[in-house]
């Protein structure tokens, strides 16, 4: 029974739960790695050993957080749980493929972990640039194992993307159009399209790297007529859409949370929100070379990528101001989920502003590969994606489990996390402006003060992570059941009670639409 339910599952709720548990576990691994990084950088001098082991930790931290924490939780966990409920579908379009998408992840994770245990590990950074990732600078199996890990994670995501696109397009009730589906459903569909279009390019790039390393090809080796810059183009054509893949489902969740706790029936500017997400998805594909301003592109190319990158700020601004407009005049309930959403809006906006700074190719020449970039993307990921995940988790926890969290503990947890991440990443802007480069395990004494503060902040965040484990335990142990959830036209996922039955919408849903 246990094996049939959890190993061979074809139920979107169970698979969503598996994704959540896997993502939470991977998140702890990733947090542990980040603590190692900050412990090393907490003061000058060496802690872990040489820079190779340090860079292996940095690389693993990035891969674990991106491919095994944020994506499985947002797309696999929340996506699987909520999309069928929100559109009134009995399950996903391809339930067995859904199961395979999940079970490709543990082997992928295993390959990534084993890559750090053989030879010297893959100390390439998550970008895996040749020639550093070639078979001279990284002899041995480490990088090959990392590449295979990425292949598996990529196949998992592509299959999941196909599944979500098919589900969302084909499994809505006949009465509703795509423009009547909730914003979270939209965000997952756009994310799935981005995955489907970008991951094959990554697969091509890392497969060429694999053959360069093992089969004597020279795709990225100038000695044989190749070009390492080609790899960078292929990688970032995936890598930039990837960062939007990480944040778009968060946009969808934040829209739901802000609407719900403002006491509104619908988010402000629904069509504008949809348009903004589609624009971000499209523009995300034509700005990739802003990661490569230092490789010697000519001035016209840099001018284009600077302008195109700045244009993304417009749809992003539409979203931020629409969230603020949704709040406006509302009867605001200061629940923990609302705090996460407000924290998201504030900190994501700061991250966006530093992104606008970095989009200037001339400035980026100076700031590229400094801690300013690290601060920028951790503001949008560690405080954008993670805050959205936390907000979504505390908001939908009663739906997933049938139990309520302790409000006071949840608010304390938010406060500790908020202080921790800001103390960790705000000083890194100063380090970057002062010229401290990324991916080094040591630094001149002049950088000590801000690094020490940053490392203290990371330990505060660690206590928040540990407290969250306690909060979830407390909720599951106390078993406070949900009384009732006020239903509006925009939160139909609660319709079947908390938690919903194993099978929902076994008969096709009938939607009586009053939208003109």
From Swiss-Prot:
Gene Ontology cellular component terms for the protein in this record: mitochondrial inner membrane; respiratory chain complex IV
Cross-link (1'-histidyl-3'-tyrosine (His-Tyr)): 240-244
PROSITE patterns, alphabetized: COX1, COX1_CUB
InterPro entries to which the protein is assigned, alphabetical: Cyt_c_oxase-like_su1_dom, Cyt_c_oxase-like_su1_sf, Cyt_C_Oxase_1, Cyt_c_Oxase_su1_BS, Cyt_c_oxase_su1_dom
Mitochondrial matrix topological domain residue ranges: 1-11, 87-94, 171-182, 262-269, 328-335, 401-406, 479-516
GO molecular function: cytochrome-c oxidase activity; heme binding; metal ion binding
Binding-site list for Fe(II)-heme a: 61, 378
Entry's Gene Ontology BP terms: electron transport coupled proton transport; mitochondrial electron transport, cytochrome c to oxygen
Localization per record: Mitochondrion inner membrane
Cofactor(s) annotated in UniProt: heme; Cu cation
Pathway, per record: Energy metabolism; oxidative phosphorylation
Binding site for Cu cation: 240, 290-291
Binding note for cofactor: Binds 2 heme A groups non-covalently per subunit. Binds a copper B center.
Membrane topology: Multi-pass membrane protein
Function: Component of the cytochrome c oxidase, the last enzyme in the mitochondrial electron transport chain which drives oxidative phosphorylation. The respiratory chain contains 3 multisubunit complexes succinate dehydrogenase (complex II, CII), ubiquinol-cytochrome c oxidoreductase (cytochrome b-c1 complex, complex III, CIII) and cytochrome c oxidase (complex IV, CIV), that cooperate to transfer electrons derived from NADH and succinate to molecular oxygen, creating an electrochemical gradient over the inner membrane that drives transmembrane transport and the ATP synthase.
Quaternary structure (record): Component of the cytochrome c oxidase (complex IV, CIV), a multisubunit enzyme composed of 14 subunits. The complex is composed of a catalytic core of 3 subunits MT-CO1, MT-CO2 and MT-CO3, encoded in the mitochondrial DNA, and 11 supernumerary subunits COX4I, COX5A, COX5B, COX6A, COX6B, COX6C, COX7A, COX7B, COX7C, COX8 and NDUFA4, which are encoded in the nuclear genome.
Family according to the record: Belongs to the heme-copper respiratory oxidase family.
UniProt-listed PANTHER family: CYTOCHROME C OXIDASE SUBUNIT 1
Protein name: Cytochrome c oxidase subunit 1
């Amino acid at each position: 029974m246990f094996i049939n339910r959890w190993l061979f599952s074809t139920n979107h709720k169970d698979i969503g739960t598996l994704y959540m548990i896997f993502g939470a576990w991977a998140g702890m691994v990733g947090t542990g790695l980040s603590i190692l990084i900050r412990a090393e950088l907490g003061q000058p001098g060496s802690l872990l050993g040489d820079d190779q082991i340090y860079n292996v930790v940095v690389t693993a931290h990035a891969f674990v957080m991106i491919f095994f924490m944020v994506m499985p939780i947002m797309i696999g966990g929340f996506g699987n749980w909520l999309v069928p409920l929100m559109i009134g579908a009995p399950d996903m379009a391809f339930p067995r493929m859904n199961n395979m998408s999940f079970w490709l992840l543990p082997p992928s994770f295993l390959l990534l972990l084993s890559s750090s245990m053989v030879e010297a590990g893959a100390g390439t950074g998550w970008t895996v640039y040749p020639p550093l990732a070639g078979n001279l600078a990284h002899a041995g199996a480490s990088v090959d194992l990392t590449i295979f890990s990425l292949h598996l994670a990529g196949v998992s995501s592509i299959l999941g993307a196909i599944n979500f696109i098919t589900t969302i397009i084909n499994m809505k009730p006949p009465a509703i159009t795509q423009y009547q589906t909730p914003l979270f459903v939209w965000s997952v569909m756009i994310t799935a399209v981005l995955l489907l279009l970008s991951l094959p390019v990554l697969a091509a790039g890392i497969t060429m790297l694999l053959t360069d390393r093992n089969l004597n090809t020279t795709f990225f080796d100038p000695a044989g007529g190749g070009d390492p810059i080609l790899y960078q183009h292929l990688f970032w054509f995936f890598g930039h859409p990837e960062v939007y893949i990480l944040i778009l489902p968060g946009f969808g969740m934040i829209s739901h949370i802000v609407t719900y706790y403002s006491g509104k029936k619908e988010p402000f500017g629904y069509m504008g929100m949809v348009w903004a997400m589609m624009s971000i998805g499209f523009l995300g594909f034509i700005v990739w070379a802003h990661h490569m301003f230092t490789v010697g592109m000519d001035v016209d190319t840099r001018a284009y990528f600077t302008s195109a990158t700045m244009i993304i700020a417009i749809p992003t601004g539409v979203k931020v101001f629409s969230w603020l407009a949704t709040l406006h005049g509302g009867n605001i309930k200061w629940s923990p989920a609302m705090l996460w959403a407000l924290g998201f809006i504030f900190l994501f906006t700061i991250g966006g502003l530093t992104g606008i700074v970095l989009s200037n190719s001339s400035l980026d020449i100076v700031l590229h590969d400094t801690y300013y970039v690290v601060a920028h993307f951790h503001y949008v990921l560690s405080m954008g994606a993670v805050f959205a995940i936390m907000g979504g988790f505390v908001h939908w926890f009663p739906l997933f489990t049938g139990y309520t969290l302790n409000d006071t503990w949840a608010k304390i947890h938010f406060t500790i996390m908020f202080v921790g991440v800001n103390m960790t990443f705000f000083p890194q802007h100063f380090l970057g402006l002062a010229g401290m480069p990324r991916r080094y395990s040591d630094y001149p004494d002049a950088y000590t003060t801000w690094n020490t503060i940053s490392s203290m902040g990371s330990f505060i965040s660690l206590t928040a992570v540990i407290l969250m484990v306690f909060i979830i335990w407390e909720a599951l142990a106390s078993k406070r059941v949900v009384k009732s959830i006020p239903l509006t036209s925009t939160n139909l996922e609660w319709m079947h009670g908390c938690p919903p039955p194993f099978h929902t919408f076994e008969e096709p849903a009938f939607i009586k639409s009053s939208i003109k």
